[in-house]
Amino acid sequence: MDLRQFLMCLSLCTAFALSKPTEKKDRVHHEPQLSDKVHNDAQSFDYDHDAFLGAEEAKTFDQLTPEESKERLGMIVDKIDADKDGFVTEGELKSWIKHAQKKYIYDNVENQWQEFDLNQDGLISWDEYRNVTYGTYLDDPDPDDGFNYKQMMVRDERRFKMADKDGDLIATKEEFTAFLHPEEYDYMKDIVVQEPMEDIDKNADGFIDLEEYIGDMYSHDGNADEPEWVKTEREQFVEFRDKNRDGKMDKEETKDWILPSDYDHAEAEARHLVYESDQNKDGKLTKEEIVDKYDLFVGSQATDFGEALVRHDEF
């Protein structure tokens, strides 16, 4: 099995992941922070730049002159204004921020696209994905290397079908993104819960009991005492995870654990940007209002045009 296939299988299937005896396995999907910078506008707008552009793109703007920053910001505003009414709403800003934060996901899909789109038709069929990913293992789906490729392929096919909204077994780029990164799509939430639930539910009764819950996180090492975090997780299961106190977690309880309702950082940042930039206080932003506050949105550190780092692949 080549390295690419090995990494692909590992990224799509968690059933075979192993933990060190005292290493906690985290199944929970949290909304990522918009930036690792401190959000303090009195000191700098670095947090806002990372949130609005994504951390990597924000570094690019740091190399531009103010004039270039304003010009490129104006181009971005045209993209944010989804309904082309000349205004940017809080909702449109929130959508843009979420898009900017997920740019690494889209880049990941782009990097893999040509590898799977064998006939170069701009789509990826299930057959194309299966042949590239499993290839020679189709004839021997149960080799002696510890991987059950038949089981992995069945799981991948189920996920592919769920991502494939129109049911034609051919994925558009957006559907393929949902297949590779289901945690980012609301309509894929069930599979995000179902897959780890199947991994943890060792007795296949459709529930996760306390021992299965702990066993997924912690492998006991001989006579060693359980670390403190394991005791805490036992208490968490009894007090919070098992809401109906029947000694096990059903699908909804598992969903609440794996996909918690986190604070919406993108919504908060969109609200903040509108508040700081909305000069006439009408609850929406014009391009002029945004560009006037370019230092808040994108910033600029370069003062010499010759220092500018010019990129042509803007988003």
UniProtKB/Swiss-Prot annotation:
Glycosylation: which residues? N131
Q: Which residues carry this modification: Phosphothreonine?
A: T65, T254
Which residue ranges run through the membrane?
none
Residue numbers binding Ca(2+) 1: D81, D83, D85, E92
Sites bearing Phosphotyrosine, chain numbering: Y47
PROSITE patterns, alphabetically?
EF_HAND_1, EF_HAND_2
Sorted keywords for this record are:
Acetylation, Calcium, Endoplasmic reticulum, Glycoprotein, Golgi apparatus, Membrane, Metal-binding, Phosphoprotein, Repeat, Sarcoplasmic reticulum, Secreted, Signal
Q: Per UniProt, where does Ca(2+) 5 bind?
A: D242, N244, D246, K248, E253
The Phosphoserine modification is found at S44, S69, S261, S277
Quaternary structure (record): Interacts with GGCX.
Q: What is this protein called?
A: Calumenin
